Design a protein with these regions (language model features):
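Short, mixed-charge, low-aromatic patches
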Residues: 1-3, 15-19, 97-101, 163-168, ...
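Regulatory N- and C-terminal appendages and interdomain linkers associated
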Residues: 1-80, 294-466
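Active-site-adjacent bridging/hinge elements
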Residues: 14-20, 111-122, 209-213, 282-292, ...
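Short, contiguous strand/loop micro-motifs
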Residues: 28-30, 128-130, 233-234
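Conserved ATP-binding subdomain of kinase catalytic cores across diverse folds
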Residues: 34-37, 43-54, 62-224, 268-270, ...
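An acidic intrinsically disordered interaction segment
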Residues: 105, 109, 272-283, 385-400
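ATP-dependent phospho-/nucleotidyl transfer catalytic cores
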Residues: 136, 166-257, 268-356
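Hydrophobic HxD+1 residue recognition
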Residues: 259-265
């Protein structure tokens, strides 16, 4: 059984103040013609002490952006650069969002409330700073499904429809508008460090390293790691652990993010910013999510490679502070860390106890053969073979020594897994777009959360000690 987030008192803690002078710009939210509450995360609002807000108060804070008590007096648009499809872009930053508030959750973690679609900023360039309502709905679906599947992800905290007609090239237009608030474990990206390196702000680079170590604490590097006492090296090891686990969690979930640019890499290892995402309809390493990913750079099977490449850019960004050798040593841990995370997470989703990397790898290889030859998607495969049921041949033999986990939840006997394939996503959106019927979406969220209960507690994301 999976536990709900631990409730908490509202505890504001604006740690970003320590680095805001070089990391952010104060901005103002757009004024919208209407504010209709469409989604409120009733699991996570309690975890940050905001569950007692009335809907009217909710809209005032998350649709009109009146500051929360004792929190940031003005929103902050964060500065960063990034490699986008491996082309360096120095002209980006928070172009349609900002950091709105920071507070502690029931476990004592510092969490951020950030926005998407809240208006223009100094980094909007020619864009309008808005989010389509469909984009907001897709964020709900992606984050709820990923959280259920054990991925370390941001949470969609609020969606408010804002009453504007938007023109978009990738949606039938005009289309409805929204503003989203996400709950995230930080908003510091690899691209945040890249910008400081590009501008040769080495003192600020060191300040940001210290901020991340203090704000998002993690374990020390291995005893034999060169340079392990250097702050930048400690952070490099922690981020490598976190992102290796993220790569594995995407693969086990059968999820394709679509735009794994360095500005979309959170140093806490948390997945966020969901645009053209897709789930696999069948096991296919070459499957892509984004129509504009014509070379397959961010295809399903290349996601670990993409994330490791991004870590290489992180190492380069830290190079003004330390020598290359200890950074390379940290980066070289990615492969083994990824393999171990794959084994741990694959066994968890399959409903068997891990027996160590060697035995687990045999299960993974046999499972991939079954999915590939049977043209099965991960959702169907993991559901059919939960705890070893229905396994035949090499898969049955590979799983025979693994202890099955609990399959008593009635979800496992209903005959059909929850999934998030594109046809269902479009059907859910059509109900909203054509009839303003939100019931199918809310019902889907309920079913996803029920699946999470059946799956039980997911493996803990590594690289954190607080």
């Amino acid at each position: 059984m999976r536990h709900d987030p631990q409730p908490a008192e509202y505890t504001p803690d604006t740690r970003i103040d320590a680095v805001a002078d070089f990391l952010a710009d104060p901005v103002r939210a757009a004024e919208f013609p209407q504010a209709t509450l469409r989604f409120r995360n009733d699991r996570w609002d309690k975890a940050v002490g905001l569950g007692s807000l009335s809907d009217e108060e909710w809209v005032r804070h998350f649709g009109r952006f009146d500051p929360l008590p004792d929190n940031l007096p003005q929103p902050l648009a964060l500065r960063y650069h990034g490699h986008q499809f491996r082309n360096y872009n120095p002209e980006i930053g928070d172009g349609r969002g900002f950091l709105f508030a920071q507070m502690r959750d029931g476990a004592g973690r510092l969490l951020d409330l950030g926005t998407k679609g809240s208006g223009t900023t100094p980094y909007s360039r020619t864009a309008d700073g808005r989010l389509t309502l469909k984009g907001g709905v897709r964020e709900i679906l992606a984050t709820e499904m990923l959280e259920a599947l054990g991925v370390n992800t941001s949470r969609t905290f609020s969606i408010i429809e804002t009453g504007e007609a938007l023109e978009r090239g990738d949606e039938p237009s005009p289309t409805r508008s929204a503003v989203m608030v996400r709950l995230s474990h930080g908003h510091i990206r690899i691209g945040s460090f890249q910008r400081l390196m590009a501008f040769e702000e080495n003192d600020n680079l060191a300040r940001l390293v210290d901020y991340c170590l203090a704000t998002y604490p993690g374990p020390p590097p291995p005893e034999d790691a060169p340079g392990r006492d250097e702050p930048a090296i400690r952070l490099m090891h922690q981020v490598t652990e976190r992102l290796a686990d993220l790569a594995a969690s995407y693969m086990v979930a059968g999820f394709v993010h679509g735009v794994l640019n360095t500005d979309n890499m959170n140093i806490t290892g948390e997945s966020f910013d969901y645009g053209p995402w897709r789930w696999l309809p069948a096991w296919d390493p070459g499957f892509t999510a984004a129509y504009f990913d014509q070379t397959g750079l961010y295809a399903f099977g290349r996601q670990p490679e993409a994330i490791r490449w991004n870590l290489g850019q992180f190492a380069i960004a830290l190079r003004p502070l330390v020598e290359a050798e200890p950074l390379i040593a940290a980066l070289e841990r990615f492969g083994p860390l990824f393999q171990n995370a794959m084994a741990r997470r694959f066994c968890w989703r399959l409903g068997i106890a891990s027996r160590g990397l060697e035995a687990d790898a045999v299960v993974i290889n046999a499972a991939e053969v079954v999915m590939r030859e049977g043209k099965l998607g991960p959702d169907e495969f993991f559901y059919r073979h939960r705890g070893g049921r229905g396994a035949q041949g090499a898969l049955r033999e590979a799983m025979s020594g693994h202890e099955p986990l609990d399959t008593s939840h009635e979800y496992w006997s209903e005959g059909q897994p929850e999934s998030m394939l594109i046809d269902e996503v479009e059907t859910l959106w059509s109900a909203i777009d054509e009839r303003d019927d939100w019931t199918p979406l809310y019902d889907k969220v309920t079913r996803i959360r029920r699946m999470a209960q059946a799956l039980g507690e997911a493996p803990a994301a590594p690289g954190h000690t607080g």
